[in-house]
Protein backbone atom coordinates (compact mmCIF):
# COMPACT_ATOMS: atom_id res chain seq x y z
CA UNK A 1 0.00 0.00 0.00
CA UNK A 2 2.80 2.38 0.89
CA UNK A 3 4.49 1.60 -2.43
CA UNK A 4 1.35 2.37 -4.38
CA UNK A 5 0.86 5.65 -2.54
CA UNK A 6 4.49 6.61 -3.20
CA UNK A 7 4.13 5.89 -6.92
CA UNK A 8 0.91 7.84 -7.04
CA UNK A 9 2.45 10.96 -5.55
CA UNK A 10 5.54 10.67 -7.75
CA UNK A 11 3.56 10.34 -11.00
CA UNK A 12 1.30 13.35 -10.47
CA UNK A 13 3.10 16.69 -10.07
CA UNK A 14 1.68 19.24 -7.72
CA UNK A 15 0.18 22.57 -8.75
CA UNK A 16 3.13 24.38 -7.24
CA UNK A 17 5.50 22.53 -9.54
CA UNK A 18 3.40 23.45 -12.58
CA UNK A 19 3.49 27.07 -11.58
CA UNK A 20 7.26 27.00 -11.31
CA UNK A 21 7.75 25.44 -14.80
CA UNK A 22 5.23 27.58 -16.76
CA UNK A 23 7.17 30.89 -16.98
CA UNK A 24 10.30 29.21 -18.30
CA UNK A 25 8.45 27.23 -20.99
CA UNK A 26 6.42 30.23 -22.05
CA UNK A 27 9.53 32.32 -22.34
CA UNK A 28 11.25 29.70 -24.48
CA UNK A 29 8.26 29.46 -26.78
CA UNK A 30 8.10 33.22 -27.10
CA UNK A 31 11.79 33.47 -27.90
CA UNK A 32 11.39 30.75 -30.55
CA UNK A 33 8.46 32.58 -32.08
CA UNK A 34 10.38 35.82 -32.19
CA UNK A 35 13.32 34.13 -33.86
CA UNK A 36 11.09 32.58 -36.50
CA UNK A 37 9.44 35.91 -37.18
CA UNK A 38 12.78 37.63 -37.44
CA UNK A 39 13.98 35.00 -39.89
CA UNK A 40 10.77 35.34 -41.89
CA UNK A 41 11.09 39.11 -41.97
CA UNK A 42 14.68 38.82 -43.17
CA UNK A 43 13.52 36.48 -45.91
CA UNK A 44 10.73 38.86 -46.88
CA UNK A 45 13.19 41.73 -47.04
CA UNK A 46 15.59 39.80 -49.25
CA UNK A 47 12.77 38.86 -51.64
CA UNK A 48 11.53 42.44 -51.64
CA UNK A 49 14.96 43.85 -52.45
CA UNK A 50 15.55 41.28 -55.18
CA UNK A 51 12.22 41.97 -56.91
CA UNK A 52 12.61 45.75 -56.73
CA UNK A 53 16.11 45.42 -58.16
CA UNK A 54 14.64 43.57 -61.14
CA UNK A 55 12.17 46.41 -61.78
CA UNK A 56 14.99 48.91 -61.49
CA UNK A 57 16.92 47.09 -64.24
CA UNK A 58 19.70 46.11 -61.84
CA UNK A 59 19.32 42.37 -62.33
CA UNK A 60 20.16 39.63 -59.83
CA UNK A 61 23.65 38.65 -58.65
CA UNK A 62 24.98 35.16 -59.15
CA UNK A 63 23.24 32.47 -57.07
CA UNK A 64 20.69 35.05 -55.95
CA UNK A 65 17.85 33.32 -57.77
CA UNK A 66 18.53 30.06 -55.89
CA UNK A 67 18.57 31.92 -52.55
CA UNK A 68 15.27 33.63 -53.32
CA UNK A 69 13.70 30.32 -54.33
CA UNK A 70 14.69 28.76 -51.02
CA UNK A 71 13.38 31.77 -49.15
CA UNK A 72 9.99 31.48 -50.85
CA UNK A 73 9.82 27.79 -49.93
CA UNK A 74 10.57 28.56 -46.28
CA UNK A 75 7.96 31.30 -46.14
CA UNK A 76 5.26 29.05 -47.52
CA UNK A 77 5.81 26.67 -44.60
CA UNK A 78 5.28 29.37 -41.97
CA UNK A 79 2.11 31.10 -40.81
CA UNK A 80 2.99 33.99 -43.12
CA UNK A 81 2.55 31.78 -46.16
CA UNK A 82 -1.22 32.32 -46.13
CA UNK A 83 -0.65 36.06 -46.69
CA UNK A 84 1.78 35.56 -49.54
CA UNK A 85 -0.60 36.55 -52.35
CA UNK A 86 -1.70 39.73 -50.57
CA UNK A 87 1.90 40.71 -49.89
CA UNK A 88 2.89 40.05 -53.49
CA UNK A 89 0.10 42.25 -54.83
CA UNK A 90 0.13 45.09 -52.33
CA UNK A 91 3.87 45.41 -51.83
CA UNK A 92 6.05 43.92 -54.55
CA UNK A 93 4.01 44.28 -57.74
CA UNK A 94 2.51 47.65 -56.89
CA UNK A 95 5.88 49.20 -56.11
CA UNK A 96 7.50 47.65 -59.17
CA UNK A 97 4.80 48.90 -61.57
CA UNK A 98 5.00 52.39 -60.12
CA UNK A 99 8.72 52.40 -60.85
CA UNK A 100 8.03 51.56 -64.52
CA UNK A 101 5.13 53.99 -64.83
CA UNK A 102 6.90 57.02 -63.39
CA UNK A 103 9.31 57.07 -66.34
CA UNK A 104 6.57 57.47 -68.95
CA UNK A 105 3.71 58.93 -66.96
CA UNK A 106 3.82 62.45 -68.40
CA UNK A 107 4.58 61.52 -72.01
CA UNK A 108 2.04 62.12 -74.77
CA UNK A 109 1.55 61.34 -78.42
CA UNK A 110 4.16 59.45 -80.37
CA UNK A 111 6.71 59.73 -77.57
CA UNK A 112 4.33 57.92 -75.26
CA UNK A 113 3.80 55.14 -77.80
CA UNK A 114 7.52 54.60 -78.27
CA UNK A 115 8.29 54.75 -74.54
CA UNK A 116 5.43 52.44 -73.64
CA UNK A 117 6.54 49.96 -76.29
CA UNK A 118 10.06 49.94 -74.86
CA UNK A 119 8.70 49.53 -71.31
CA UNK A 120 6.53 46.61 -72.38
CA UNK A 121 9.44 44.90 -74.10
CA UNK A 122 11.52 45.16 -70.94
CA UNK A 123 8.70 43.95 -68.70
CA UNK A 124 7.59 41.09 -70.95
CA UNK A 125 11.11 39.89 -71.79
CA UNK A 126 12.98 40.40 -68.50
CA UNK A 127 10.77 41.21 -65.53
CA UNK A 128 7.96 38.72 -66.08
CA UNK A 129 10.20 35.64 -66.61
CA UNK A 130 12.31 36.62 -63.58
CA UNK A 131 9.23 36.96 -61.38
CA UNK A 132 8.01 33.55 -62.49
CA UNK A 133 11.43 32.08 -61.68
CA UNK A 134 11.65 33.69 -58.24
CA UNK A 135 8.17 32.56 -57.22
CA UNK A 136 8.38 29.18 -58.91
CA UNK A 137 7.47 27.34 -55.65
CA UNK A 138 4.10 29.11 -55.72
CA UNK A 139 3.04 27.51 -59.01
CA UNK A 140 -0.32 25.76 -59.01
CA UNK A 141 -2.12 28.47 -57.05
CA UNK A 142 -4.73 30.73 -58.59
CA UNK A 143 -4.31 33.46 -59.56
CA UNK A 144 -0.83 32.69 -60.77
CA UNK A 145 2.14 35.03 -60.53
CA UNK A 146 1.94 35.66 -64.27
CA UNK A 147 -1.73 36.66 -64.06
CA UNK A 148 -1.12 38.96 -61.11
CA UNK A 149 1.81 40.66 -62.84
CA UNK A 150 -0.07 41.20 -66.10
CA UNK A 151 -3.16 42.53 -64.32
CA UNK A 152 -1.05 45.01 -62.37
CA UNK A 153 0.69 46.13 -65.56
CA UNK A 154 -2.71 46.66 -67.19
CA UNK A 155 -4.24 48.63 -64.33
CA UNK A 156 -1.16 50.56 -63.19
CA UNK A 157 0.48 51.40 -66.52
CA UNK A 158 -1.64 50.71 -69.63
CA UNK A 159 -4.89 52.21 -68.35
CA UNK A 160 -3.31 55.03 -66.36
CA UNK A 161 -1.34 56.74 -69.14
CA UNK A 162 -2.85 58.73 -72.02
CA UNK A 163 -2.71 55.85 -74.45
CA UNK A 164 -6.16 56.39 -75.95
CA UNK A 165 -5.37 59.96 -76.93
CA UNK A 166 -2.08 58.89 -78.48
CA UNK A 167 -3.79 56.20 -80.57
CA UNK A 168 -6.52 58.60 -81.70
CA UNK A 169 -4.06 60.91 -83.45
CA UNK A 170 -4.29 60.80 -87.23
CA UNK A 171 -0.61 60.30 -88.01
CA UNK A 172 0.21 58.07 -85.05
CA UNK A 173 2.69 55.27 -85.80
CA UNK A 174 1.77 52.36 -83.55
CA UNK A 175 4.77 50.12 -82.75
CA UNK A 176 4.19 46.36 -82.99
CA UNK A 177 4.94 46.03 -79.27
CA UNK A 178 1.80 48.05 -78.47
CA UNK A 179 -0.40 45.63 -80.40
CA UNK A 180 1.32 42.70 -78.71
CA UNK A 181 0.83 44.28 -75.29
CA UNK A 182 -2.88 44.84 -75.81
CA UNK A 183 -3.50 41.36 -77.18
CA UNK A 184 -1.57 39.69 -74.36
CA UNK A 185 -3.39 41.71 -71.72
CA UNK A 186 -6.81 40.96 -73.18
CA UNK A 187 -6.13 37.25 -72.66
CA UNK A 188 -5.88 37.70 -68.87
CA UNK A 189 -9.17 37.67 -66.96
CA UNK A 190 -10.04 38.31 -63.36
CA UNK A 191 -12.02 35.92 -61.20
CA UNK A 192 -14.89 38.43 -61.10
CA UNK A 193 -15.41 38.10 -64.84
CA UNK A 194 -15.66 41.04 -67.23
CA UNK A 195 -14.83 44.24 -65.36
CA UNK A 196 -14.82 47.91 -66.27
CA UNK A 197 -11.06 47.88 -66.68
CA UNK A 198 -11.29 44.98 -69.13
CA UNK A 199 -13.85 46.86 -71.24
CA UNK A 200 -11.58 49.91 -71.26
CA UNK A 201 -8.81 47.69 -72.54
CA UNK A 202 -11.05 46.47 -75.37
CA UNK A 203 -11.68 50.04 -76.49
CA UNK A 204 -7.93 50.44 -76.88
CA UNK A 205 -7.63 47.19 -78.84
CA UNK A 206 -10.28 48.35 -81.32
CA UNK A 207 -8.03 51.25 -82.31
CA UNK A 208 -5.11 48.94 -83.10
CA UNK A 209 -6.66 45.66 -84.29
CA UNK A 210 -9.43 45.65 -86.89
CA UNK A 211 -11.60 43.67 -87.12
CA UNK A 212 -11.64 42.70 -83.46
CA UNK A 213 -14.10 40.30 -81.84
CA UNK A 214 -14.73 41.69 -78.37
CA UNK A 215 -17.09 40.97 -75.53
CA UNK A 216 -20.07 42.67 -77.16
CA UNK A 217 -19.53 41.75 -80.79
CA UNK A 218 -17.33 42.37 -83.79
CA UNK A 219 -15.65 45.74 -84.17
CA UNK A 220 -14.18 47.09 -87.38
CA UNK A 221 -13.12 50.42 -88.83
CA UNK A 222 -16.65 51.01 -90.12
CA UNK A 223 -18.17 50.56 -86.65
CA UNK A 224 -19.46 47.80 -84.38
CA UNK A 225 -21.14 44.76 -85.86
CA UNK A 226 -23.01 42.89 -83.16
CA UNK A 227 -23.62 39.80 -85.29
CA UNK A 228 -21.27 37.11 -86.50
CA UNK A 229 -18.09 37.71 -88.45
CA UNK A 230 -18.45 39.15 -91.97
CA UNK A 231 -16.39 37.92 -94.88
CA UNK A 232 -14.81 40.61 -96.99
CA UNK A 233 -16.29 41.03 -100.44
CA UNK A 234 -13.00 40.43 -102.16
CA UNK A 235 -13.07 36.80 -101.03
CA UNK A 236 -16.35 36.23 -102.90
CA UNK A 237 -16.01 35.99 -106.66
CA UNK A 238 -19.56 37.06 -107.39
CA UNK A 239 -22.58 37.26 -105.15
CA UNK A 240 -24.82 35.66 -107.79
CA UNK A 241 -22.57 32.65 -108.15
CA UNK A 242 -22.46 32.33 -104.39
CA UNK A 243 -26.26 32.35 -104.26
CA UNK A 244 -26.45 29.68 -106.93
CA UNK A 245 -23.98 27.47 -105.12
CA UNK A 246 -25.92 27.90 -101.92
CA UNK A 247 -29.03 26.44 -103.55
CA UNK A 248 -27.32 23.04 -103.87
CA UNK A 249 -28.87 21.96 -107.21
CA UNK A 250 -29.72 18.29 -107.62
CA UNK A 251 -30.74 16.12 -110.56
CA UNK A 252 -34.52 15.89 -110.56
CA UNK A 253 -37.29 14.83 -112.92
CA UNK A 254 -40.17 16.87 -114.27
CA UNK A 255 -42.55 15.37 -111.79
CA UNK A 256 -41.83 13.89 -108.40
CA UNK A 257 -44.22 11.06 -109.20
CA UNK A 258 -42.70 10.16 -112.58
CA UNK A 259 -39.09 8.96 -112.64
CA UNK A 260 -36.59 10.33 -115.11
CA UNK A 261 -36.18 6.93 -116.78
CA UNK A 262 -38.99 4.44 -117.13
CA UNK A 263 -38.35 0.75 -116.52
CA UNK A 264 -36.21 -0.97 -119.15
CA UNK A 265 -37.93 -3.50 -121.37
CA UNK A 266 -35.80 -6.26 -122.87
CA UNK A 267 -36.59 -8.15 -126.09
CA UNK A 268 -34.71 -10.37 -128.48
CA UNK A 269 -34.16 -8.99 -131.97
CA UNK A 270 -34.58 -11.29 -134.94
CA UNK A 271 -31.46 -12.85 -136.34
CA UNK A 272 -29.49 -11.08 -138.95
CA UNK A 273 -29.34 -12.23 -142.50
CA UNK A 274 -25.64 -12.96 -142.44
CA UNK A 275 -24.99 -15.07 -139.40
CA UNK A 276 -28.31 -15.32 -137.67
CA UNK A 277 -26.90 -13.90 -134.47
CA UNK A 278 -29.30 -12.21 -132.10
CA UNK A 279 -28.68 -8.97 -130.30
CA UNK A 280 -30.36 -8.10 -127.02
CA UNK A 281 -31.75 -4.60 -127.10
CA UNK A 282 -32.78 -2.32 -124.27
CA UNK A 283 -35.47 0.17 -125.15
CA UNK A 284 -36.10 3.26 -123.07
CA UNK A 285 -39.32 5.20 -123.35
CA UNK A 286 -40.00 8.81 -122.46
CA UNK A 287 -36.37 9.78 -121.88
CA UNK A 288 -36.04 13.54 -121.84
CA UNK A 289 -33.06 14.95 -123.66
CA UNK A 290 -31.95 18.14 -125.30
CA UNK A 291 -31.54 18.51 -129.08
CA UNK A 292 -28.03 18.60 -130.47
CA UNK A 293 -26.86 21.97 -131.81
CA UNK A 294 -25.81 21.24 -135.42
CA UNK A 295 -24.27 17.97 -134.35
CA UNK A 296 -24.87 14.27 -134.85
CA UNK A 297 -27.07 12.18 -132.65
CA UNK A 298 -27.51 8.42 -132.68
CA UNK A 299 -30.90 7.48 -134.16
CA UNK A 300 -32.04 3.97 -134.82
CA UNK A 301 -31.75 2.81 -138.40
CA UNK A 302 -33.11 -0.67 -138.80
CA UNK A 303 -30.61 -2.47 -140.93
CA UNK A 304 -29.95 -6.07 -141.62
CA UNK A 305 -27.40 -6.25 -138.82
CA UNK A 306 -29.62 -4.58 -136.23
CA UNK A 307 -27.14 -1.77 -135.50
CA UNK A 308 -27.65 1.95 -135.14
CA UNK A 309 -26.49 4.38 -137.77
CA UNK A 310 -25.42 7.97 -137.15
CA UNK A 311 -27.59 10.51 -138.90
CA UNK A 312 -27.62 14.31 -138.67
CA UNK A 313 -30.21 15.84 -136.43
CA UNK A 314 -31.76 19.22 -137.23
CA UNK A 315 -31.07 22.06 -134.86
CA UNK A 316 -34.18 23.00 -132.94
CA UNK A 317 -32.77 25.61 -130.56
CA UNK A 318 -30.30 25.90 -127.76
CA UNK A 319 -30.63 23.82 -124.63
CA UNK A 320 -30.14 25.91 -121.47
CA UNK A 321 -29.39 22.96 -119.22
CA UNK A 322 -26.42 21.52 -121.09
CA UNK A 323 -23.50 20.57 -118.91
CA UNK A 324 -20.90 21.40 -121.58
CA UNK A 325 -20.41 24.52 -123.70
CA UNK A 326 -21.48 24.45 -127.37
CA UNK A 327 -18.16 26.06 -128.33
CA UNK A 328 -16.35 22.78 -127.61
CA UNK A 329 -18.47 20.63 -129.95
CA UNK A 330 -16.30 18.09 -131.77
CA UNK A 331 -17.96 18.79 -135.14
CA UNK A 332 -17.35 22.52 -135.07
CA UNK A 333 -13.98 23.83 -136.08
CA UNK A 334 -12.39 27.23 -136.40
CA UNK A 335 -13.82 27.67 -139.94
CA UNK A 336 -17.42 27.66 -138.68
CA UNK A 337 -17.00 30.99 -136.91
CA UNK A 338 -17.26 29.60 -133.40
CA UNK A 339 -16.47 32.03 -130.57
CA UNK A 340 -13.10 31.74 -128.83
CA UNK A 341 -12.73 29.45 -125.85
CA UNK A 342 -13.96 31.10 -122.67
CA UNK A 343 -12.02 31.22 -119.43
CA UNK A 344 -12.74 28.56 -116.79
CA UNK A 345 -14.29 31.13 -114.49
CA UNK A 346 -16.71 32.38 -117.16
CA UNK A 347 -17.51 28.81 -118.14
CA UNK A 348 -18.43 27.88 -114.60
CA UNK A 349 -20.60 30.98 -114.31
CA UNK A 350 -22.48 30.07 -117.51
CA UNK A 351 -23.10 26.55 -116.28
CA UNK A 352 -24.30 27.77 -112.88
CA UNK A 353 -26.59 30.35 -114.50
CA UNK A 354 -28.08 27.73 -116.79
CA UNK A 355 -28.62 25.43 -113.84
CA UNK A 356 -30.35 28.17 -111.90
CA UNK A 357 -32.57 29.20 -114.84
CA UNK A 358 -33.74 25.67 -115.64
CA UNK A 359 -36.99 25.16 -113.80
CA UNK A 360 -37.53 21.66 -115.17
CA UNK A 361 -34.34 20.08 -113.83
CA UNK A 362 -30.89 18.99 -114.89
CA UNK A 363 -30.69 16.44 -117.69
CA UNK A 364 -27.54 14.78 -118.88
CA UNK A 365 -27.18 14.08 -122.60
CA UNK A 366 -25.01 11.09 -123.42
CA UNK A 367 -25.48 11.28 -127.21
CA UNK A 368 -22.25 13.09 -128.12
CA UNK A 369 -20.47 10.28 -129.89
CA UNK A 370 -18.92 11.13 -133.26
CA UNK A 371 -19.68 9.39 -136.54
CA UNK A 372 -16.18 8.01 -136.91
CA UNK A 373 -16.19 6.29 -133.54
CA UNK A 374 -19.45 4.49 -134.32
CA UNK A 375 -18.27 3.40 -137.76
CA UNK A 376 -15.00 2.06 -136.39
CA UNK A 377 -16.86 0.12 -133.76
CA UNK A 378 -19.16 -1.45 -136.36
CA UNK A 379 -16.19 -2.40 -138.52
CA UNK A 380 -14.60 -4.19 -135.58
CA UNK A 381 -17.61 -6.46 -135.36
CA UNK A 382 -18.46 -5.58 -131.80
CA UNK A 383 -21.72 -6.33 -130.05
CA UNK A 384 -22.98 -2.95 -128.91
CA UNK A 385 -25.74 -2.54 -126.40
CA UNK A 386 -27.89 0.51 -127.12
CA UNK A 387 -29.72 2.58 -124.50
Swiss-Prot record:
Sites of Phosphoserine modification: 253, 373
Compositional bias ranges of the Low complexity kind: 310-321
GO BP: phosphatidylinositol 3-kinase/protein kinase B signal transduction; positive regulation of phosphatidylinositol 3-kinase/protein kinase B signal transduction; TORC2 signaling
Top-level taxon of origin: Eukaryota
Keyword Phosphoprotein: yes
Chain segments carrying region Disordered: 11-33, 262-347, 365-387
Keywords: Cell cycle, Phosphoprotein, Tumor suppressor
Pfam families hit by this protein: HbrB
InterPro entries: Bit61/PRR5
Stored PANTHER family: PROLINE-RICH PROTEIN 5, TARGET OF RAPAMYCIN COMPLEX 2 SUBUNIT BIT61-RELATED
Subunit field text: Associated component of the mechanistic target of rapamycin complex 2 (mTORC2). Binds directly to MTOR and RICTOR within the TORC2 complex.
Function as written in the Swiss-Prot or TrEMBL entry: Associated subunit of mTORC2, which regulates cell growth and survival in response to hormonal signals. mTORC2 is activated by growth factors, but, in contrast to mTORC1, seems to be nutrient-insensitive. mTORC2 seems to function upstream of Rho GTPases to regulate the actin cytoskeleton, probably by activating one or more Rho-type guanine nucleotide exchange factors. PRR5 plays an important role in regulation of PDGFRB expression and in modulation of platelet-derived growth factor signaling. May act as a tumor suppressor in breast cancer.
Annotated family: Belongs to the PROTOR family.
Name this polypeptide is given: Proline-rich protein 5
Organism: Rattus norvegicus (Rat)
Lineage of the organism: Eukaryota, Metazoa, Chordata, Craniata, Vertebrata
Amino acid sequence: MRTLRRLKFMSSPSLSDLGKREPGAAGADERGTQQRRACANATWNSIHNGVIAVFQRKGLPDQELFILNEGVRQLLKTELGSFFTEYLQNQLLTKGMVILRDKIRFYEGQKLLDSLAETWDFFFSDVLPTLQAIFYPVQGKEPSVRQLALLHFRNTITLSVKLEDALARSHACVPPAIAQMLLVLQGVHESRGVTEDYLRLETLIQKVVSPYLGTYGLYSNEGPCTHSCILEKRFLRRSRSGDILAKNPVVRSKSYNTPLLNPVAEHEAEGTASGGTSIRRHSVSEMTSCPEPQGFVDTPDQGPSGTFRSSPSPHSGPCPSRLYPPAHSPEQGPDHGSPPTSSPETLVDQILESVDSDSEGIFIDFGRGSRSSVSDFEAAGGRPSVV
